[in-house]
Amino acid sequence: MSQVNMRDMLKAGVHFGHQTRYWNPKMGKFIFGARNKIHIINLEKTLPMFNEALTFVERLAAGKNKILFVGTKRSAGKIVREEAARCGMPYVDHRWLGGMLTNYKTIRQSIKRLRDLETQSQDGTFDKLTKKEALMRSRDLEKLERSLGGIKDMGGLPDALFVIDVDHERIAITEANKLGIPVIGVVDTNSSPEGVDYVIPGNDDAIRAVQLYLNSMAEAVIRGKQGAATSADEFVEEAPAESAEG
């Protein structure tokens, strides 16, 4: 089972919230106190909630479900991309396009356009075009890759969202809520936990904290997938023996 511990969280600075004047009262029960006008998050509360979220993700991955990693602010984007790719999950790291979930039909058409352009760039089609046309298509491809590259292999709506900084990604959460897609989110002291099914109270800015969340989630996905593969192997091994008896 995927687990995170108190020492890892302290080292990563998960307990440092935002300035006290920016606090959201809905996060009051997760705040331990204040130090130098900065709210300190109670990691005794975070620990079981973080581990519960990891267990949920591991279970989803074991069932071949898709978890969409979302983190579009500068401090998160690169790590979101790397960790999601490492565990084979879709991601949005650049900008959330309105309707990415609620208007998935249209998004799917844009993904098809992206795939067509990818093929054209590799099969020599671009070489046969005028310089201007080739340049326009290259720019199109670049733009589509940046905004949709992380979800081009998603193949349909995700089964859950994992979000870094719920305030920054509020549109994504609202869309997921409308469609009944569960949301796992890192919620800092200045944010609202509303609309988040699995709240992880913690610092959503520090690179080391963001790295810890994403690394732990990716590990949970990998563990879930490995568990599913192991049980599938066992099932295959047992199946012939049973049919031989029959």
UniProtKB/Swiss-Prot annotation:
What is a single cellular component term in the Gene Ontology annotation? cytosolic small ribosomal subunit
GO MF terms here are: structural constituent of ribosome
- Please indicate if the UniProt record lists Chloroplast as a keyword: no
UniProt KW keywords: Ribonucleoprotein, Ribosomal protein
PROSITE patterns under this entry?
RIBOSOMAL_S2_1, RIBOSOMAL_S2_2
What top-level branch of life does the organism fall under? Bacteria
Q: Does the keyword Mitochondrion apply?
A: no
Q: Which CDD domains match?
A: RPS2 (cd01425)
InterPro entries attached to this UniProt entry: Ribosomal_uS2, Ribosomal_uS2_bac/mit/plastid, Ribosomal_uS2_CS, Ribosomal_uS2_flav_dom_sf
Q: Name one GO biological process term.
A: translation
Mind telling me which SUPFAM superfamilies this protein's record contains?
Ribosomal protein S2
Which protein family is named in the record? Answer: Belongs to the universal ribosomal protein uS2 family.
Q: Which PANTHER family match?
A: 30S RIBOSOMAL PROTEIN S2 PROKARYOTIC AND ORGANELLAR, SMALL RIBOSOMAL SUBUNIT PROTEIN US2M
What is the name of the protein in this document?
Answer: Small ribosomal subunit protein uS2
Q: Which organism is it from?
A: Pseudomonas aeruginosa (strain ATCC 15692 / DSM 22644 / CIP 104116 / JCM 14847 / LMG 12228 / 1C / PRS 101 / PAO1)
Gene that produces this protein: rpsB
